[in-house]
Amino acid sequence: MKWYERQFLVYDGVLIPLGRALFNADNRAFRYGDAIFETIRISKAEPLFWDWHYQRLILGMSVLKMSVASLPSKQQLRESVTDLVVKNRIFADARVRLTVFRKGEGFYAPRQMQVSWLIEADNLGSTGYSFPDKGLKIEVYTDFPKQLSPVSPFKTAGSLPYVMAGIFAKENAVDDCLIVNSAGKIIESYNSNLFWVKDEIIYTPIIASGCIDGVFRKAVIEAAARLKVKVVECSGASLEEMRDADEIFLTNVISGIRWVAAFKDRRYYASISKRLQREIDEFINL
């Protein structure tokens, strides 16, 4: 038996071996990017921040005019996620991707609003968040600004700005890179939300700037409130604000907090970001 025949995914509630074909070339996610997804961290066989993930998914589906009624309930989806992790014998933490896409044929205008859903699970090989000893080296990518739209806060299949930014980071030998919106403001990185610290105040772009409405972004803001550290949501950052910051860090639900050590000619340290990760770990009992 090949390795992929021992691993499974869930497609519309059915366990399917990983290597099996799932759909035809007329699939709307493939043809038109007519899909939305959530990336979820599993710890101790349970999805972290599940309520927030589900809330964002349902809101995004509503914006895209997908039929929420055709999706299983929150509890049924959660059980499908945890069952898949167990079936794939993942004993460390896992990365789960839950993708929802519109069914049916048609060209740009769909013939129906009902959805199909797909769950994939990969072993992260570690347990719990680990604050990194080494900081990131980052750059800024300006060739493909992210356009502000009703779907900007959500993770959709139309991810070309992030793909191109990821290529830019690889070509320039940096760990991550920041992207800008159509107004030229720095709003996030290609896979994370952005925070920076100046004079012990935390700044982060507001959702209306075009950044992803990140689940871990929300966790950081709540952790800062518990630590009584002020958070200011702003329209985004300029290059000067990035250079002038005391601390920069990036967040996503898979990696947690990653601190930035170098941006252009500046060097940074990690202080508040380390306190925030510790507070989040304690709050979610990791």
Can you describe what each PLM-predicted range is?
Residues 81, 87-100:
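Ordered, amphipathic secondary-structure segments that act as subunit-interaction surfaces
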Residues 1-83, 106-286:
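Helix-start/capping segments and mature chain N-termini
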